[in-house]
Every structure is written in C-alpha cells, then in structure tokens.
Amino acid sequence: MKKRDFMKISVEGAVAMSSLNAKENNAGERVEKSKVPLANPSKEAAANAAKNPFGLVYDDAISKNEAGKVNLTPVSYKSRGLDIAANVYTPANFDPNKSYAAIVVAHPNGGVKEQVAGLYAQRLAELGYVAIAFDAAYQGASGGMPRNVDTPANRIEDIRAAADFLLKFKGVDRDRIGVLGICGGGGYTLKAAQTDKIFKVVATLSAFDSGLARRNGFLDAQISTIQQRLKDASDARAKEVLTGEVEYVPDPDLTDEEIAKITNDLYREGLKYYHRTHAHPNSTFAYTKSSLLELMNFDAASNMDLINQPLLMMVGSKADSAYMSERAFAGASGTQKKEYFKIDGALHIDTYYKPEYVDVAMKKLAQFYGENL
C-alpha cells in the first residue's frame, strides 16, 4: 500500500507506545508480530519530550512543581484491569481539605496526555479547577495488549474511569465534575455524557466523530469502499485468532513536501503537529486494523437527545471538520442550555496550540464552566 493510499484511512488514528513482540495480557496467547512502528521514534519527538521533565510538549508547560503555582502529579489507576497513566493538574495553593470542581480532559485521536490535552488541563487548573489528562487504554503510557487497540467502547470507558478516579481524589467536589473532549476525545465525550450523569457539564473542542470518519472517510471520501474495508478488518481479526499476528493500519511516514501537498487542512496540519512541532515518543496514528469492526459501527451523533446537561461545542470557523460537530449539535434536543461556538479564523489543529485561538477557547470555557459547574 502506498503512503497516500493509507493516508486517507490512518491520519486520524490512535496513539500508543512501542510494544513489539509482547504477549497479549488478556487471552494470554496472542503475540504481536507487527513490523509497523507502534510509537514515534523520530528525532523531533525525542527532542520535544526531552525539553520538559514531565515530557510535556506544549508551550508554557509546567517544568517543576512550586508552591503558589499550578502543580502536576503523575498518577496511575485501574480501569477494567488495565493500568491507566494520567497527569492530575491542581490549582495554585491547592488545599485537599477544601472543595474544588474538576474536569476530565479526553485527548484527540493521535494524541497523548502530554500534548493538547495537557495544555487545556493546565489552563483549566490555572482557572482553579482540578483537571486530569490521561492516556487511553492500550495507548500512550497506559497498559493493554495488543498495543494500539482503538475501539469506541474502550475510549468511552476511559472517560468514565477518569471521573471514577476524581471521585476518590481528595479535594474534588463529587457533585461538580465536568468534561472536555478534544477531537476524537470530543466524539467519545458526547457518548460518555449521554448516559453517565456524573458529568454535570459537557464541552467539546474541534470534536471528531471517529465512527463517521472511519466508515465514510473524512468528508465522505470513502463511501464507495466501505464493504471492502469491512472485509479487510474482518480478515485481520480472523488472522489474529488463527495466527496470533496483529495487523495495523500504519502511521503515514511523509516528507515535509508530501505533507504540504495534502489538501485537507485537518490531515495536513495534523501531521505537522503530531509529526513535527508537537511530536511525542508515545504518539502515533497506527491502530489495529480489527478495531475498524467497532469503529465503523460507531456514531457519535446518535442519541444526542440523551444529553440533558449544559453543552458547549466549540469549533474553528475555518475547520474542515466542523460538519461533525454541527451534525451532533443538531441532535442535542434534550438540553435546555447549549451553545455552538465558533473560534473565528481557526482551523481544527489551530485550536490545539496557537495562543490566539487557545485563549479564545479558554475564555469561553471559563465562562461556561463558571456559570454551570
């Protein structure tokens, strides 16, 4: 398969750390034999992470914990028997004997907690919230085999498990837990909040419907190949069962010149972000091909009427992914308080790191959470 052929399938993919030839820890028999890199071995990724003691790759990231400032505490907790790696950001002068509202921040497809999810978690802590950014199960620094499984059920449970952790975190007001989902994490956040009312407020930034994109292709570019791709995913699952070999949709390895020629803003700017400017060693777009069996049956926009909490959905006004948020927001008939907010001039990826757009998003979040949480 040529790079440009799999680009359409894999660019919005999942994240994971390298774990080649590792035994599968559930069935106990499966062994990964993939030749696909399951992490980012690039010099850019290593250099970015090395700049910060916590491995954070966003601007103005915490580099040490100091009194009177936002602090970061790496934590680990169990979810369905797996170890989940997370960072908890606490406000300046945090006092565990007091009561604080808290926010779960769900990372994008292709992201880890040290990237945009960490940025927004830190900024929320600066506003006085306890915030948690975590790596999805089977991805990043979290546990799970095979690596890079990327299924909706897992991603939704990850969000719930982060809230479970906050329920037991001393200083968190259990009646004031909200959620912020970014990109793919936004789509899964909508699903989690439809049924789990632990989340008192729901916000998304540049939400991405992973099911819609995997099924139809981004901007409906792959509708004609749905059945063939389902057949390929079915064959990949059968291969796992019969041989133990795990097939992956690979992470595209493109030159700067090839990236510049990509016409979709999301994919072009996303590759720049994840492969260059904000690359992280644990971040990759590779995911197990068999995951498509669940992904292609997922729809973030279905049952949106079940959300009765205050809802804020933010998109860049120039984002080519905005149709996904529009589609989901249109179905949100169950809440009396909802807002679809456009960040003027921003593309999808711009909202991840460009100060002029991050500041607008944070100002809106401050208002939204302040009024409703």
Task: Describe each region flagged by the PLM.
Residues 110-122:
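The serine-hydrolase catalytic nucleophile loop
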Residues 5-25:
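N-terminal export signals
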Residues 51-98:
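N-terminal cap/lid segment of alpha/beta-hydrolase-fold proteins
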Residues 123-141:
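Conserved alpha/beta-hydrolase
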Residues 149-170:
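Alpha/beta-hydrolase active-site loop
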Residues 307, 313-315:
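Short beta-strand/loop motif that positions the catalytic acidic residue
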Residues 190-272:
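Alpha/beta-hydrolase-fold enzymes
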Residues 346-358:
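Catalytic histidine-centered segment of alpha/beta-hydrolase-like enzymes
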